[in-house]
Amino acid sequence: MTTRIDTRFADLKQQGRPALVTFVMAGDPDLDTSLQILKALPAAGADVIEIGMPFTDPMADGPAIQAAGLRALKAGTTLKKTLGLVRDFRATDNATPLVLMGYYNPIYIYGVDAFLADAKAAGVDGLIIVDLPPEEDEELCLPAMKAGLNFIRLATPTTDEKRLPAVLANTSGFVYYVSITGITGSASADASAVGAAVQRIKRHTNLPVCVGFGIRTPDAAQAIAAQANGAVVGSALIDALKASLDAEGRATKGTVGAVADLVASLAAGVRGAKQAAE
C-alpha cells in the first residue's frame, strides 16, 4: 500500500529537502478554531500534520500539551469529533498527510475495528500510539496495517541495537525519533547526537526518520532537519496558540495567525536544511 505519507516523503526526497512535521491538539481551544488552524498549516509550510487525540491521562506529554488536551476536552472534543475534524479538513485538502497521535485507551473504548474503519473513511493516514509497545502489535498495529493505515513507532536514545529491530519490525510511514528522554517540551535537542542516532536507526530501516521533542526555533528546526528526513514541532506551536488566547482561554482574532506565522518561520528553517544523506 502507498499512503499519503509515503507519497509526501517520496516527493520531498526528489526535492532533496526534509519535512516539517507539525503537531496540534484536536479541538484546542475549540473545534472551529482547531479546524481553521489545521487548514492554515499546509499553506504555512507544514508537510505532515500530527493531530493529538485528547486524553485525560497523557503521561508522556509535558505541561503545554497536557494543558492543550484539557482545553480540548473542556471544549467537548471526543475521538468521534476528532475524526470529524479530519473529515472536514479532507473536504478541501486531499494531499497533506494526517497522523493521529495519542494513547490507546480512547481507541480501545471506541472499538478497534470501528475506529480503524472510521479513521480510514475520514482520511487519516497513520497512527502514533505512544503506550503500545511492539509486543502488543496484535492489538492495533497489525489491524491498522490491514486497514491501510501507517503505524509509526517512536525510537528513543535508550532504544538499543537489540531493541531496534523489534521497534521497527511493523513500523511504516516514518520512524519518529524522540531526541531527548523525558516528556515533551522539556529540553532542547543536540544536533550532532541526533545525527549519530538517525544513522544508527537507518542501518535497520529504509524508512524516513523524523526527529521531535525539543525543537522550538527555526534555527533548531534547520539544525535537526539537516540530520534527518524531517523535524517535528509540537510544544512550541501549542505555546504560540496558548499565548494568543484571551483571559478565559478562548480563541482570539490572532489565534490562527499566531500558529501559522510560527509554522511559516519553522518551515523556512527546515527548507534551509539539505536532506540528510540517505
From Swiss-Prot:
InterPro entries: Aldolase_TIM, RibuloseP-bd_barrel, Trp_synthase_alpha_AS, Trp_synthase_suA. It comes from the Bacteria. Gene3D superfamilies: Aldolase class I (3.20.20.70). The keyword Transcription does not apply. The gene is trpA. Its EC number is 4.2.1.20. This is Tryptophan synthase alpha chain. The active site is at residues 50, 61. One of its GO terms (molecular function) is tryptophan synthase activity. The alpha subunit is responsible for the aldol cleavage of indoleglycerol phosphate to indole and glyceraldehyde 3-phosphate. GO terms for cellular component: cytosol. It catalyses: (1S,2R)-1-C-(indol-3-yl)glycerol 3-phosphate + L-serine = D-glyceraldehyde 3-phosphate + L-tryptophan + H2O. Tetramer of two alpha and two beta chains. Belongs to the TrpA family.
